[in-house]
Amino acid sequence: MIDVNNFEYMKIGLASPDKIRSWSYGEVKKPETINYRTLKPEKDGLFCERIFGPQKDWECHCGKYKRVRYKGVVCDRCGVEVTRAKVRRERMGHIELAAPVSHIWYFKGIPSRMGLVLDMSPRALEEVIYFASYVVTESGDTPLDKKQLLSEKEYRAYRDRYGNTFQAAMGAEAIKKLLQDIDLDKEVDFLKEELKTAQGQRRTRAIKRLEVLESFRNSGNKPSWMILDVLPVIPPELRPMVQLDGGRFATSDLNDLYRRVINRNNRLKRLLDLGAPSIIVQNEKRMLQEAVDALIDNGRRGRPVTGPGNRPLKSLSHMLKGKQGRFRQNLLGKRVDYSGRSVIVVGPNLKMYQCGLPKEMALELFKPFVMKELVEKGLAHNIKSAKRKIERVQPEVWDVLESVIKEHPVLLNRAPTLHRLGIQAFEPTLVEGRAIRLHPLVCTAYNADFDGDQMAVHVPLSSEAQAEARLLMLAAQNILNPKDGKPVVTPSQDMVLGNYYLTLERAGAIGEGMVFKDTNEALLAYQNGYVHLHTRIAVPASSVNNNETFTEEQKGKLLLTTVGKLIFNEILPKSFPYINEPTKSNLEKETPAKYFVDKGANIKEVIASREEVAPFNKKILGNIIAEVFKRFKITETSRMLDRMKDLGFKYSTKAGITVGVADILVLGEKDEILHEAQAKVDKVIKQFRRGLITEEERYDRVISIWSNAKDVIQGKLMKSLDKRNPIFMMSDSGARGNASNFTQLAGMRGLMANPSGRIIELPIKSSFREGLTVLEYFISTHGARKGLADTALKTADSGYLTRRLVDVAQDVIVREDDCGTDRGLLIGAIKEGNEVIESLYDRLVGRFARKTVKHPETGEVLIRENELITEDIARAIENAGVETVHIRSAFTCNTRHGVCKKCYGRNLATGTDVEVGEAVGIIAAQSIGEPGTQLTMRTFHTGGVAGDDITQGLPRIQEIFEARNPKGQAVISEIDGVVVTINDVKDRQEVVVQGAVETRTYAIPYGARLKVTPGQEISHGQELTEGSIDPKELLKVTDITAVQEYLLREVQKVYRMQGVEIGDKHVEVMVRQMLRKVRVIDAGDTDVLPGTLLDIHQFTDANVKVLLEGKQPATARPVLLGITKASLETDSFLSAASFQETTRVLTDAAIKGKRDELLGLKENVIIGKLVPAGTGMNRYRKVDLVKTVQDDTNVENDEIYVEQ
């Protein structure tokens, strides 16, 4: 018996008639389903119990044998085997067809496989198969050619003239005869010869034919199997018939389609027995052919067969296709038990690793565990009474539940799960009510808020699953975001505001300049009203919580600080610097010396002479968390986060910051600014009327005048604002809102865009505080409506992008420690003009150096090759003035089906080296797809024609990853050389580039802006005009490296412009997947076929083999595939079929007899194996446990953090 859960590969092929018969348990002869009186299946019908097995467990059709003791007996009255009813899901039947029919996938698919094998056009095939023309199968000694088509008239004429010396036939029988006559070896050799000379159309046709014929030859499939003599009937439980309440029956469409086939087949048999006229028989055969077509793929040819209400019936192909098909609905997405969902509410008193689970929900989810425990504790005698106790909710059940859920993590998931932080594990605590309580800090990761969001709970059952949930998925472990390595659990909103308020300073506050002996005394004074949180005071430096970074000399001095900052620093680890000002040096090194004062000094004077120090905003809090994480790892960080959260909530409550209409102060000088702007606009309009400037220049100038006016107002507003204005505090702290919201409230709303995205030159001069006029309000509605429509579209687009990205990279897994490559990537800062988009430091951190880097001046070694570049080293490299560094990169990694640890570098989510088995492809896809919803949808419209619209945001990302021809394409140079002249020709310009060997002339399209000047030296692949380069063009004129770098740079540009940071390595993984195929140009002496797409590794393997034999290697050129195309070209047919174009992928795979080696994640999910990543990898599965001596360690019970 084969082990269903453990096999090495999966193969697909064409089924021969004998194979179909061997699967079958009997022939279905009648179209009947069930008897309408007895409701029992009819004998020999589509639900026959003799063929498919009994309907009830261990019971035959006539009832002679009942009970399990007759297992395996075949009833002598009704012929039904006594067995489980489950076999009705696996036993197949068959229909013996009275005439062969063609399989529509192979005849109708594009390209038509049958047509390629026979070298006939699909049109001709259709005429033969559907009985419109005869085809010559044997020409004999007549002037006819084999495979020649004859009409009815011609056929009769030739029959009269030549008698029976030639043979011609119609229908699938004729095609079958032709397919059987093919000598594959002969055809293949003939085509290979032809390829040496053929050109153009003939060559492409020959390549296509060769590919199909080679597939047949190598796979052992026979071409004649594309014609069916026997039709398999799938098991009845997979096409069920169920009784509805009203006594009517609902049935699967397949039964209708099968019934049509059986009816026509039986009628054809009868006609043949009667010896009916050929024209009637032909018509019946055609109808049989159409019935089988409809069963296999309804609607592929002609009009689909419809059921009641003109609804097309769902055929076998439709069962596989699309979101509702077998692949995506049942194999890749299953419903799971031990799960529940409920509304979420905030749980501010939870610890980082906890969540609140409603009592009734927990009881239902942990039922089996509670039952077992009840029996073990002797509270119930057996499982049945334990179950009864739970159903009656008796009081002792709750105590048992408490002990069961202790230490048993549960998973919380919020849809849409855009990245892996959308599912995290928590320790449950029981809460009253029916809502799940969620820790406020994990909301960012889930993108959750409490306006009615719901979340699902799942229970990990096995001890391995629990261990994984606790060690890898616990919320306290997931502090960093996998996309950029920055903390994702930063406080937000109230928490930020509270900590901001806590660390404010106010000159002249009550009790300024008082000196206290320690923190406690200062707090006492605060509680009794002698000082305020914002009061600047002094305490002995040695008395504060985290004084370990102070020098001995500093410890003898007084530390100038505020009461609030004393409280804030209490939450930090002892060896962390005392944070007194929001600067990088204070965070990373130590408290600045200016805050230490000798004990005898006049404290009040010293304080009065100082400026107020800025409070800590959201960004600083984020930096503090990152720094604590870097030094103290997980346990300490999550403790500190909880304390920071508590402080934030406590002091935002104390602060009582509110917003009232009186807080919005309208700017006094606004009218003057607007008058000035209006005067400038009038002047521009005058110039335009006199014909001094064009319409376009006028428009641009007007827009810029109003934009400047708005900026001036914004600047003055921000200056005039009181630093303690509640709205200002909210925006300054990063809790809510920004400067632009402010300007709209108190300054002016500014310019708006119309529905097409063009800016309307009439500005909205009012602010919300003053109120808008009717026209202004109307103009504003455009933007508001477009915003809402965009958001809805964007979500769907972004989700689809993520799906394609996941699909193309799902098999990229870290497979080994070092691939030993000698290649690398030369990187520098990414710039757009003079603006740095991504600094060298950002690109270096967490990567391995490919070559040793030395200081340009001193020559000291900054980093050796193959060593990890840490934050400090990266900073040193940048400070040394090094511009470019050679690093290891996923682009140049030699590992098959994945990457190696060295080329990938550090795992951003943990801040440590990446582990073997990490599914970096999926993480990359999630990291690029998840921020997709934050990107804009807009294409910027610069008024008029010139400088075509530049695509930005999400559409641009799709354009890059799908390798489409970009909008507003730039012209690039194909050679190195010098720009000699730029000529004006008619209505366009021409750029002449002179190289060492040849001179090229490039026509510049109308309206494009030039980027080069005469006399400038340029290199191949360089842009001559502004715009986006077409990466396919770039690949033709340069090499792979240039294309990889270009794509990486462009993706980073789009995301960084929108303020989204993504690690380079994620983009590298995706781009690598787009460039892993080559197209063979010349096969040399290898077995590969010219014109085919091959994986780079397959190609090099084939070449290595012939080179060792001293023969001619093949040549190929790299191909850039868009992600959709790349997913469909993957080696795994299961993965490709479950992605898109299911029928096409399966048709192709069957003919080639493809083997799926099950290397990716999707394939394994589909067949129900563990995914070969993480702990599912073979190297982690075959682990033996060795019992070691238990070392005596005292573990505090209430802290369950796990160090990584």
Swiss-Prot record:
Cofactor(s) for this UniProt protein: Mg(2+); Zn(2+)
Annotated Mg(2+) binding sites: 449, 451, 453
Top EC group: transferase
Keyword Transcription on entry: yes
Keyword Transcription (UniProt): yes
Binding site for Zn(2+) 2: 819, 893, 900, 903
Name the UniProt record assigns to this protein: DNA-directed RNA polymerase subunit beta'
Organism annotation: Bacillus cytotoxicus (strain DSM 22905 / CIP 110041 / 391-98 / NVH 391-98)
Lineage of the species this protein comes from: Bacteria, Bacillati, Bacillota, Bacilli, Bacillales
Gene name of the encoded protein: rpoC
